[in-house]
């Protein structure tokens, strides 16, 4: 449903600029969360992945070019608003020129448990405390291209559905299934609530009831419970890091693993000591000219090429 906007003060446009990424994500109620996708190609990939469109924003001079996409969204629900406004007015609203022609707000999907995510998976990436959205987007793009079945992020990682991460990934964040593990320090603590209500309810039932509010994804504690779960599901764990016990990336034992989980750490300090201690292998990428490390996005691409084909 096309609506020409007379005033950018319209509250329905808040989702495109006036709400922060954190407000869009709505961590305590992820079923109400929203993300923004840019460009017809990325929006089409989100639609292909089954995400629910909520509204679109298009500069008036791009309206004709986006007609086929608008028709596709109208077929999903003709009541979905397509807001149209002059390009300069949209720039004033968003703070930048809409060079990719279109923005679309989508409803987030609930995240699933690790067990459900990894049904049928053979090669997975596990990310710890990676906070750079460009790196997250690039890593997802490499994972999609190089046959990674799923990605697990701990709560210290940034959001794969952050606008920049989606843009860098070219929408491949919608093609690789993912979830989060670990307690979110910014969310309600289940154990604290249980302590307050210990005499009134069964802890197991109360934990199950509250977990969807306190955690986004799987409430397995990071790293111990998450890595134990991976091993219970048959995965060998291999951490990318440089230490005295590292094996080379082309070690035949790694390729021989039926199920392999590849762990990557934060851009600066890498994986934590506890995480390294709990992994089956520590793996290094052989390098020349005295270079001792690669950017995590580059390292993941090299690793996926070697072990996920």
Residue ranges and their predicted role:
Residues 110-245:
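RNA substrate-binding interface of SAM-dependent RNA methyltransferases
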Residues 1-61:
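Boundary-proximal intrinsically disordered activation/regulatory segments immediately upstream
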Residues 78-86:
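A glycine-rich helix N-cap at a beta->alpha junction
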Residues 5, 35, 128-129, 154-155, ...:
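Glycine- and other small-residue-rich loops at beta-strand/loop junctions that grip anionic moieties
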Residues 238-288:
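Active-site/ligand-binding-proximal alpha/beta "capping" segment
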Residues 101-104, 144-146, 160-173, 273-309:
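Structured adenosyl-cofactor binding patch, chiefly the S-adenosyl-L-methionine
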Residues 65-76, 275:
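Short, aromatic/basic amphipathic alpha-helical patches
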């Amino acid at each position: 449903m096309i609506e020409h906007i007379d005033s950018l003060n319209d509250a329905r446009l808040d989702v495109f600029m006036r709400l922060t990424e954190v407000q869009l994500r709505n961590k305590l109620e992820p079923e109400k969360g929203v993300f923004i996708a840019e460009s017809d190609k990325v929006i089409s990939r989100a639609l292909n992945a089954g995400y629910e469109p909520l509204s679109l924003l298009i500069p008036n001079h791009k309206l004709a070019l986006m007609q086929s996409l608008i028709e596709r969204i109208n077929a999903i629900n003709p009541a979905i608003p397509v807001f149209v406004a002059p390009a300069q007015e949209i720039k004033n609203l968003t703070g930048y020129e809409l060079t990719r022609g279109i923005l679309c707000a989508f409803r987030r999907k609930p995240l699933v448990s690790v067990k459900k995510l990894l049904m049928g998976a053979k090669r997975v990436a596990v990310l710890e405390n990676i906070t750079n959205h460009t790196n997250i987007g690039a890593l997802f793009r490499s994972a999609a291209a190089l046959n990674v079945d799923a990605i697990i992020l701990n709560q210290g990682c940034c959001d794969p559905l952050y606008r920049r991460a989606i843009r860098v990934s070219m929408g491949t964040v919608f093609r690789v299934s993912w979830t989060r593990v670990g307690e979110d320090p910014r969310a309600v603590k289940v154990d604290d609530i249980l302590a307050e209500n210990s005499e009134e309810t069964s802890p197991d039932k109360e934990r199950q009831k509250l977990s969807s509010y306190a955690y986004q994804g799987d409430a397995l504690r990071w790293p111990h419970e998450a890595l134990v779960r991976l091993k219970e599901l048959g995965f060998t764990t291999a951490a990318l890091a440089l230490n005295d016990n590292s094996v080379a990336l082309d070690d035949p034992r790694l390729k021989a693993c039926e199920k392999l989980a590849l762990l990557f750490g934060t851009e600066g300090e890498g994986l934590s000591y506890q995480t390294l201690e709990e992994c089956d292998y520590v793996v290094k990428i052989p390098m020349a000219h005295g270079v001792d490390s690669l950017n995590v996005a580059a390292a993941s691409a090299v690793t996926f090429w070697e072990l996920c084909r």
